[in-house]
Amino acid sequence: MPDHPISAERLLTLAQVAELLTLDVDDVLALLHEGRLRGTRLGTAAQWRIEQSSVGDYVDDQIEETRRMHLWHQSN
């Protein structure tokens, strides 16, 4: 169980995350399965809901990865 309660305001649908990240829904689903995004299946239809903070963490990770790649290319 997470250390913090998850409120409905902090949960996003697959489509919302796909739009925010300019990805296909299938790509967002893959990120969930890879553990790069945090989410859960809710409701009787068991639809995915993704933690908003997880999206921010993913973006931060992508920025850091880009920064490191840039530094690596500069050093070569």
Q: Can you describe what each PLM-predicted range is?
A:
Residues 2, 22, 45, 50, ...:
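Intrinsically disordered, low-complexity regions enriched for glutamine and histidine
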Residues 2-31, 61:
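Polyanion-binding surface elements
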